[in-house]
A protein has these predicted regions:
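Exposed beta-strand face motif in extracellular beta-rich ectodomains
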Residues: 63-67, 143-145
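Short, surface-exposed beta-strand/strand-loop-strand elements in extracellular ectodomains
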Residues: 105-113, 154-169
């Protein structure tokens, strides 16, 4: 088995919005661990030095910045990625999906009706777990959206549902259930 001498990350560049998008950047090199990162991450993002991963939702803006991850377990090899965190100046749409029974058969899409583009898609049989809640956020750019529910069965389970909220700062207004 060859010993790795370089480090590879799951992404090379990310651009996200504050308080909106969950990020997960990780080392894909087998055997990598005992890592460091420079410079410091913005608030809301957490670095796990054991798994060499970055996760969270950034809560402050950041101009395009290059971060370097180094692994002592791979002879100090390093890799870099760039991160830009922008402020979402539009309302934030939050989709809260409550899964109860038969969740693997259920899916939904969020469609921007201005462009007919699918903004968010969760297909049936894509690892949904019963008795869980999933939350997705987007920085809204459209004047109208459509939520389309799908199922690989005949219907959604009667206690499964979807809530849509608009976030205004710290306030959360429900607009659909």
């Amino acid at each position: 088995i060859p010993i790795p001498t370089s480090l590879t990350l799951s992404v090379s560049s990310l651009s996200v919005y504050t308080n909106v998008e969950q990020i997960h950047v990780y080392v894909t090199t087998l055997g990598a661990g005992n890592c460091t990162i420079t410079p410091s991450l913005p608030n809301g993002l957490v670095f796990d030095s054991v798994s060499c991963s970055i996760s969270g939702i950034a809560t402050e803006t950041l101009p395009q910045t290059t971060f370097v991850v180094s692994s002592y377990d791979v002879f100090g090899a390093s890799a870099s990625f760039t991160l830009t965190v922008n402020m979402c100046s539009n309302p934030i749409i939050e989709i809260e999906r409550v899964y109860k029974g038969q969740s693997s058969k259920e899916g939904y899409k969020l469609i921007n009706l201005d462009t007919e583009e699918t903004i968010l898609s969760v297909e049936p049989n894509s690892n949904q777990q019963d008795n869980t809640i999933s939350v997705q956020r987007i920085c809204s750019t459209a004047s109208r959206y459509e939520v389309e529910t799908t199922s690989s069965g005949d219907y959604w389970y009667k206690y499964s549902y979807l809530n849509v909220y608009v976030l205004h700062g710290a306030q959360r207004e429900q607009i659909l259930r």
